[in-house]
Amino acid sequence: MKFRPCIDIHNGKVKQIVGGSLKDQGDQAAENFVSEQDAAFYAELYKKAGLKGGHVILLNGKDSPNYEATKAQALQALGKYPGGLQIGGGICPENAAEYLEAGASHVLVTSYVFKNGVISWENLEKIRNAAGKEHLVLDLSCRKKDGNYYIVTDRWQKFTEEIVTLELMEKLGSYCDEFLVHAVDVEGKAHGVETELAELLGQYTAHPVTYAGGVGSMADIEELRRAGQGRLDVTVGSALDIFGGSIPFEVLAEMK
């Protein structure tokens, strides 16, 4: 299990938000933490700690008046740590190369691939061809409904018809290098991980899988290690001391 850091950017600022609270209308979100530091500061911190494979997420839609400020922050972070960070948020074949050339190791994609509630295999091929399989991470962010974990899109606001299963991951795995999975219902709440989801993800062995959502303590990290059979990497946001939480960054920085 490795620690994968994050830089979440909303309205041009590095923030930690409650995952299910994003609303495109008015660019609103329930905030846990708003940093006085810029995205490049965190990129430099992760670089110095030798942490690779973290992700930068743009939390504004392309139609937002704040999108350009958010994108500018993201590009600064990539420039500070070339090859060390992945990027997601509004990625499509038309802009994937721009982010890779700016220093991203991988691009993260959800909404472009899961169109109108189902997988667009055509779009998946397009983004794989544009970015290259070795630079593509599929973000299977999901929310629980009727006992299943459904993939959600559009900044986690829209449910798709696609359920996270091993079979689905095996099919999608031929197109990508890694998976990132946000457990959106617990994201930003730091009240514990989605154990059932972690147990499912821990059965998948073909590609690296990073779990994000709900980690509030070192006990939660250990629970995730147990549930995921040690196979899952972990992203911690709101619970980290660098984002106003109590888990020391230095402790997790040893997990690499």
Question: What name fits each language-model region?
Answer:
Residues 14, 19-67:
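N-terminal beta-alpha supersecondary unit
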Residues 119-130, 221-256:
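C-terminal helical cap(s) of enzyme catalytic domains, especially alpha/beta-barrels
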Residues 51-72, 111-117, 181-190:
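Glycine-rich, proline-tolerant flexible connector loops at the mouths of alpha/beta enzymes
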Residues 55-56, 108-109, 137-139, 180, ...:
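Conserved beta-strand positions in the central sheet of alpha/beta enzyme cores
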Residues 67-74, 120-125, 161-166, 191-199, ...:
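Charged helix-capping and loop-helix junction motifs
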Residues 8, 46, 54, 87, ...:
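Conserved, mostly hydrophobic/aromatic
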Residues 73-106, 196-234, 250-252:
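Catalytic cores of alpha/beta
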Residues 10-11, 17-25, 100-186:
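Conserved anion-binding
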